[in-house]
Amino acid sequence: IDLILDEPESKFIKALIIVPTRELALQINKAIEAYSYFTGTSSIAVYGGGSGADFSQEKTALTQGVDIVIATPGRLISHMSMGYVNFSKLRFLVLDEADRMLDMGFQPDLLRIIDITNPKRQTMLFSATMPQGVLKLAKTMLHDPATITIALSKPAEGVTQSAYLVKKKKKIPLM
């Protein structure tokens, strides 16, 4: 959000976050709205399965200008096909849960979306697992990528963990 605020004011989409499900799109949009509340940064969740009114609201936001779009691939392709999106000034592209999107068969849609984005963008790909499909996708869209691997978390050695069943009214006094 901070980097988007440094961008000149425009009607163009500055950041695109592609996610596999409407639930994740809504969750991320809610977080962005909270983080950017006092900044004037605008965002919209674009996903299928809603009413025609939802599509119309999405179209209005996409054509009149929005800073951050959080979208599912299928619905975004629908808007692209109708000429409602312009990614020529896109600065940031995020693929969240890339492994899940590939499992759901979205690879052709992802490649189609990536193909029309500004090539001078920063691209981030997040995945819980790194199967061959994700590695192949990463090679086609990332330039000089940095990989961050997080190990499974375990309790620190020498620390004993315990759980106690306590009635609600006794929780505070027992803490």
Predicted regions and their residues:
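Small/polar loops that bind or transfer phosphate-bearing groups
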Residues: 16, 20, 47, 102, ...
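Short internal alpha-helix immediately C-terminal to a glycine-rich phosphate-binding loop
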Residues: 1-8
